[in-house]
From Swiss-Prot:
Reaction it catalyzes: an alpha-Kdo-(2->6)-lipid IVA + ATP = a 4-O-phospho-alpha-Kdo-(2->6)-lipid IVA + ADP + H(+)
EC numbers for this chain: 2.7.1.166
Pathway: Bacterial outer membrane biogenesis; LPS core biosynthesis
Source organism per UniProt: Vibrio vulnificus (strain YJ016)
Alphabetized InterPro entries for the sequence: KDO_kinase (IPR022826), Kinase-like_dom_sf (IPR011009)
Top EC class for this record: transferase
Name of this chain's protein: 3-deoxy-D-manno-octulosonic acid kinase
Name of the gene: kdkA
Length: 236
């Protein structure tokens, strides 16, 4: 069950299946370190901490800005409403996608703290076990056509729900040990009507393959993307 709890100028939205006692400390890495519950980390735009909850392993991420503006205002965003905060929006989008059968991480808890006209935010979501992103995999070996078709199918499922993944790239697509395809990182993504943006998602993904082929010499060829499109189009 999805519930919310207010703590002064802070609010938590959480799934009571995974969080029985909502508290602000859940979003503090030092809290997890003190309990020896940090089981790993990943560095990108800031550090994502992997923490062990009683029934699930979670990824704890603090929202940070990128680009030039992010160097000036690192983690503050304009406050409009609680539901419009980046953490709450991503939480509910993940919930919508999971309910529609799309393979995305479970949303566990979202946090936002209002500071005057601005806010800061964090998200706890499921860590996908035994999974690697496409960049990591393709640096080691190529993928067969069947896996590319499965990637296309998963993207099509997301599009059928009407969700625009504005940063669809090969860092945000995972394959786990059972060869299940997962799509992650829905910050700034949103529901959208129409169809034109769907091709833009696919074009962005293809540019990502080409970029990493030059940058990291990944094992990828243009024909692989055609296999992905075959899977995608099978769902239309």
């Amino acid at each position: 069950m999805i519930e919310q709890q207010q703590f002064g100028q802070s609010r938590i939205c959480y799934d009571s299946e995974w969080v029985s006692s909502p508290e602000l400390a859940l979003f503090d890495p030092q809290y997890w370190q003190a309990q020896n519950k940090v089981v790993g980390s990943a560095t990108g735009r800031g550090t994502t901490w992997f923490v062990q909850l009683p029934k699930i392993t979670a990824a704890l991420r603090h929202y940070r800005r990128g680009g030039l503006f992010g160097k000036l205002v690192k983690d503050h965003y304009w406050f409009r409403s609680w539901s419009a905060t980046r953490s709450f929006a991503e939480f509910h989008l993940l919930k919508q996608l999971r309910e529609a059968g799309v393979n995305v991480p479970r949303p566990i808890a979202a946090y936002a703290m209002r500071k005057g006209l601005f806010y800061q935010a964090d998200l706890l979501s499921e860590r996908i076990a035994n999974a690697q992103d496409l960049v990591t995999i393709l640096q080691k070996h190529s993928l067969n056509a069947e896996l590319y078709q499965k990637i296309g199918v998963e993207i099509a499922k997301m599009h059928r729900v009407g969700v625009n993944h504005t940063d669809l790239n090969i860092h945000n697509i995972l394959i786990d040990a059972q060869e299940t395809i997962w799509i992650i990182d829905f910050d700034k993504c949103y529901p959208q009507a129409g169809d034109g943006w769907k091709q833009e998602n696919l074009d962005r993904l293809k540019r990502s393959f080409n970029k990493e082929r030059v940058k990291r010499s990944i094992h990828w060829h243009d024909k692989d993307f055609q296999a992905l499109l075959t899977g995608y189009e099978s769902q239309q």
